[in-house]
Amino acid sequence: MRMRLGLATLLATASLMAQVAYAGPEIVAGPGVDPACFAPWSADTKFLQWPAKEGPFKIAVVNGFVGNTWRIQMIKTAKAFAEDPSMKDKIAEFKVVSTGTDAPAQLGAIEDFINQGYDAIVTIAVSPDGFDRVIRLADKSNVVLVPFDNVLDTDAVMQVNEDQLAMGRAYGDWVVKQLAELGKTSGKILEVRGLAGNSVDRDRSIGINAVLDENGGPWERVSVVGNWDDGTAQKVVADAIAVHGQFDAIAAQGGTTGVVQAMLDAGHPMVPIAGEAENGYRKLLAKHSAEGLKGISIGQSPGLVAIAMKAAVSALEGNPMPQLISVPLPIATYDQLEDGVNYWTDLPDNFFTVNEFPPCGVNITGPSIMSQSEADVN
């Protein structure tokens, strides 16, 4: 009996020690490694440090929705960056899966990769909450989980993003200022929203509408859902014009090439517009700005996946990292566009133009991205 009790005690102690050894990252004092690349979100951002592992590492990208060009380019960018000389020797295995808009399916895929012994999982969250269980499992297994783009409403994991609220405010500021130059302090605004139910769409919309609330008015606001997709956005904007008539300005979270094409097809006057960084949109700005299409282009780069992958590897190497990493907003206005520099007439309209991050030494070229497939890597 004593031997049995002793064995049980030893097993319980070993289990407890294993749980303690892999209890997630430690909160440490800053600064973190390479602050020019991995900039903390604010002065209040905490720093996390995982136990160093020996590479090369097993890394997975778990995407959700894959039905628009941004997500497709993101997947291609992840594959291209995994083959980049700066990363290739640090990766032993690399997998990419897209699970659709079903949150349980995404959570299940993340859990599967944790159970398969992957070292890091980079993900675009379908929902900003509901990840508590997989976060605990990742911590228990000493796995680095890195949400980016559509991030989580938690500070328990390292995350990478641009400031979506600031982006929405920049959209709103542009529209308000351009209308003021035309002598308008009120009017009808069309907001083209993104994919419903995630933090990016929510925060950008909050930013846009906060600026409208703070400036002039009254503003008549019409909102349509474009899913950040050119085809969808073109259809819903065409429908909005047919139902509501002319708008004084447009703030589009994405699918901006389709938004402008809907205006052109409907014979809608060229009005101030705020939109994303699609190559086609920038082509149209360059072509029609003299006709009144005064636009701003702010990019949420698909290349964020590369920064998230780079951050994951840095964390696995034992470096202290900001809990929330801030990537600056890449902004270009209609009068700053230059062919071959920040848009390309010889690349497809659905190519997203911002894929270079000089502070991180990351520059994924257009040809290397476009040569990849968007298919899962299993």
What is the role of each PLM region?
Residues 1-22:
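Gram-negative bacterial Sec-dependent N-terminal signal peptides
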Residues 22-378:
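A residue-level marker of the well-folded mature domains of exported/periplasmic proteins
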